[in-house]
Amino acid sequence: MADEEVQALVVDNGSGMCKAGFAGDDAPRAVFPSIVGRPRHQGVMVGMGQKDSYVGDEAQSKRGILTLKYPIEHGIVTNWDDMEKIWHHTFYNELRVAPEEHPVLLTEAPLNPKANREKMTQIMFETFNTPAMYVGIQAVLSLYASGRTTGIVLDSGDGVTHTVPIYEGYALPHAILRLDLAGRDLTDYLMKILTERGYSFTTTAEREIVRDIKEKLCYVALDFEQEMATAASSSSLEKSYELPDGQVITIGNERFRCPEALFQPSFLGMESAGVHETTFNSIMKCDVDIRKDLYANTVLSGGTTMFPGIADRMQKEITALAPSTMKIKIVAPPERKYSVWIGGSILASLSTFQQMWISKQEYDESGPGIVHRKCF
């Protein structure tokens, strides 16, 4: 470990996308979908080199002949064989490194079950023979990336949304809340409301198109009712989008109705509180003495917080819920889509962090349980 030139690898495994690269870099080298595809039928063309599984972009492009699986659901790994394939692809195909030569920092969802952390640790040391590894909580890494050690992180990705209060670098588990409403649900909802407008999007290929429409054209309204009125009375909010086949579609109030579901989950038929209320509830579960620090350091993280207008709307909604004298600050770093990875990159390259790695030797002596003693 004394060798300065050995770069650590940082891998952030999200439900939708896997972000991977080298510690010390300011952005991940590889970003690809967290999917594993297996051929639906036995290959007819013998000797055509048909593989028994495909990962990431290759699985995406061959999806017509494959059955696609997402090994990470709602932020938690549910299929370890496929997860191993994703890690293998990350090291050997994307980063082109030998994992036995680099320490590896992995990320995990808040409240990840203990058995899961142990399994990650075991696979890294036993399957990939890494010299050292560490598991960091995603929201905590995002907070580090924003230059803070205290604050509350609203982390919303493709599969799950969490509100995570953090005090002096430690997540407060009793106050973490999870909302099973994230990017994938918003894409599905946009597919549904575009269908109501007369456009049909149903296949997985079409879902990707809708995801692109969502990312390019959707925004969060500051005042939903007022925005609906504006949309009804004029065409100023309408935008057009060209489909791959050249057809041009027009999208109006769908642009802000789609992400409004984050604030009003009832749009999706869910009874849960919206992201603003969930953030407030999380803060209220914390000790009264630290709430002020959380309100003033509310950090947005993850791809689903990338909608224009979301920070202003959060500011407005939380101001309405909080005590009237409270100073509220919503922090929305421009690179927040990758802030978990960036936080991992920063952490793994700190000189003070080097004693925090779990080494192969420690693992051999203590077994997978070592992860609970060294990563918290």
UniProtKB/Swiss-Prot annotation:
Pfam families: Actin. It is an enzyme of class 3 (hydrolase). Its main location: cytoplasm. It is found in: Cytoplasm, Cytoskeleton. GO terms for cellular component: cytoplasm; cytoskeleton. Disulfide bonds: none annotated. Its EC number is 3.6.4.-. Keywords: ATP-binding, Cytoplasm, Cytoskeleton, Hydrolase, Nucleotide-binding. The keyword tRNA-binding does not apply. It catalyses: ATP + H2O = ADP + phosphate + H(+). InterPro entries: Actin, Actin/actin-like_CS, Actin_CS, ATPase_NBD. It comes from the Eukaryota. One of its GO terms (molecular function) is ATP binding. SUPFAM superfamilies: Actin-like ATPase domain (SSF53067). Actins are highly conserved proteins that are involved in various types of cell motility and are ubiquitously expressed in all eukaryotic cells. Belongs to the actin family. This is Actin-2. It comes from Schistosoma mansoni (Blood fluke).
